[in-house]
């Protein structure tokens, strides 16, 4: 019990009390609207978002003043010539302040992460996992486990839950009131923080703001798993964010300790499973174990009850699916993963006698869900729902080489991401769709037929759809001497993969 209390102990001195005045500092908005920050994988460039570099502390002060008035964010006729924002609606002003507000709200998380590193609570960056730690887990661990649970992260039943979550980090009342205003201003934000939505699908106008809310929500949901990982040396945690694994329960300590004081030691043995593994990416995570089905059901029951009673999160039991790895494929990271039992007969000769011995080996397989992938390609308007390629509309000033490079790059990126698949032949259908869609697009542009266009381009057109592996192998090996089937059956996990491919993210 003392260990639990020590883990949950709050350091009140680190809570931030004076964040609200930062809203009136111009450098905050320079950070929020900087090209370098917004040019990352999560943010679109500034010109795509519609910023016009006219942010100033004076305008921000006026906007915040209007927030406290009855008709907030309504620009009067007299102010139209003064502020220079003629033609912008109120969403722009709220967007501008919310982006700066998100930068400010990230400060407590950043300070805690830095202080943890200084106190050597985090050995190097072992706890700051990424998508790359999931790949070796699949290769080395999963084939030795029996059961897997697919779990969708529960979402709040009310927007106030998000405010209460951040209240444990921040004691600045004006900042929390402003957060409430933003949440009610964008009422659809509750639908954005759902398990089926990925981080990359957030609203482009407020990506930083909603990404911060999503991470703080996941941060809270993972708190119980982080503590249990400390109780079991084999409970691995993988996360796609930097600060998501450093979790404290904060304001829930007293209630949590009172509830668990009597029966915590009785139930802790349940979680000390030396073969339990936890992996999360975006809005979905899995629990895999070598234990029995009964153990997995107990995990499910405790997680649901814990989230509902102590975090006030709505977590339906039907969102947690328990299945055996041997006869069930689960979807994760754009793959259909499963464990198959491969049997083989070995003939042993001993003197004059010979024996046939059947051996069984667990083999981990990752397959490309071709039907769902075609659905994603159809949603991107490269084909119809039945997989028949169609032409896409292009700009009149686009050159043929630019169009071909665009289609070829889409396929190479998709093939590069699915290089970890056990059977890459299924991607041939996607190559056919993209190649013919490109040909139809070019034929439509030149008002010609697909047959005539392909005849004119010849092999130059086909080479654009070769992957990097195929290009290298074609230079090193003769086509008739290299066993091509091996290149389609070997899994390769590339370290430059930092997030799930957009077309593969069809969940």
UniProtKB/Swiss-Prot annotation:
Which GO MF term does the entry hold, naming one?
RNA binding
Pfam families for this protein: Intron_maturas2 (PF01348), MatK_N (PF01824)
Annotated Gene Ontology cellular component terms: chloroplast
Q: Name one GO biological process term.
A: mRNA processing
Ordered alphabetically, the record's keywords are: Chloroplast, mRNA processing, Plastid, RNA-binding, tRNA processing
Subcellular localization, per the record? Answer: Plastid, Chloroplast
For this chain, the family text in UniProt reads: Belongs to the intron maturase 2 family. MatK subfamily.
Q: What does this protein do?
A: Usually encoded in the trnK tRNA gene intron. Probably assists in splicing its own and other chloroplast group II introns.
Stated name of the protein: Maturase K
């Amino acid at each position: 019990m003392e260990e639990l209390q020590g883990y949950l102990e709050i350091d009140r001195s680190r809570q931030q009390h004076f964040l609200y005045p930062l809203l009136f500092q111009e450098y905050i908005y320079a950070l929020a609207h900087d090209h370098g920050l917004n040019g990352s994988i999560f943010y679109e460039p500034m010109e795509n978002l519609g910023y016009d570099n006219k942010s100033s502390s004076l305008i921000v002060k006026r906007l915040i003043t209007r927030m406290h008035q009855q008709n907030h964010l309504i620009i009067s006729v007299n102010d139209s010539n003064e502020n220079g924002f003629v033609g912008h609606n109120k969403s722009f002003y709220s967007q501008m302040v919310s982006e700066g507000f998100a930068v400010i709200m990230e400060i407590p998380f950043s300070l805690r992460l830095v202080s943890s590193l200084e106190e050597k609570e985090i050995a190097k960056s072992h706890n700051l996992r990424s998508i790359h730690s999931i790949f070796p887990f699949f290769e080395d661990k999963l084939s030795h486990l029996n059961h897997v649970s697919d779990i969708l992260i529960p979402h709040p039943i009310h927007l106030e839950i998000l405010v209460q979550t951040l209240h444990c980090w921040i004691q600045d009342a004006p900042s929390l009131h402003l957060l409430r205003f933003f949440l009610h201003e964008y009422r659809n934000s509750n639908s954005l923080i759902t398990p089926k939505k990925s981080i990359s699908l957030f609203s482009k106008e407020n990506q930083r703001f909603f990404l911060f809310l999503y991470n703080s929500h996941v941060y809270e949901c993972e708190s119980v798993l982080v503590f249990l990982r400390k109780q079991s040396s084999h409970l691995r945690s993988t996360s796609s964010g930097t600060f998501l694994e450093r979790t404290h329960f904060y304001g829930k300590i007293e209630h949590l300790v009172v509830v668990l004081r009597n029966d915590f030691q009785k139930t802790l043995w349940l979680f000390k499973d030396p073969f339990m593994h936890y992996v999360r990416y975006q809005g979905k995570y899995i629990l895999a174990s070598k234990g029995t089905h009964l153990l997995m059901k107990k995990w499910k029951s405790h997680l649901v009850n814990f989230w509902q009673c102590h975090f006030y999160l709505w977590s339906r039991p039907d969102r947690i699916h328990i299945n055996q790895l041997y006869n069930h494929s689960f979807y994760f990271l754009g793959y259909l993963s499963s464990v198959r039992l491969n049997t083989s007969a070995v003939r042993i000769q001993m003197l004059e006698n010979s024996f046939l011995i059947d051996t069984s080996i667990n083999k981990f397989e990752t397959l490309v869900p071709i039907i769902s992938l075609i659905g994603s390609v159809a949603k991107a308007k490269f084909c119809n729902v039945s997989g028949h390629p169609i032409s896409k509309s292009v700009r009149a000033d686009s050159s043929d080489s630019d169009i071909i490079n665009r289609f070829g790059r889409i396929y190479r990126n998709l093939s590069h991401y699915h290089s970890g698949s056990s059977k890459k032949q299924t991607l041939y259908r996607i190559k056919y769709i993209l190649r013919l869609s490109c040909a139809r697009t070019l034929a439509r542009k030149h008002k010609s037929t697909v047959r005539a266009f392909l005849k004119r381009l010849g092999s130059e057109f086909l080479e654009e759809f070769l992957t990097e592996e195929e290009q290298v192998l074609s230079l090193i090996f003769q086509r008739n001497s290299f066993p091509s089937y091996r290149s389609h059956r070997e899994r390769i996990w590339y370290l430059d993969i930092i997030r799930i491919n957009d077309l593969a993210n069809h969940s």
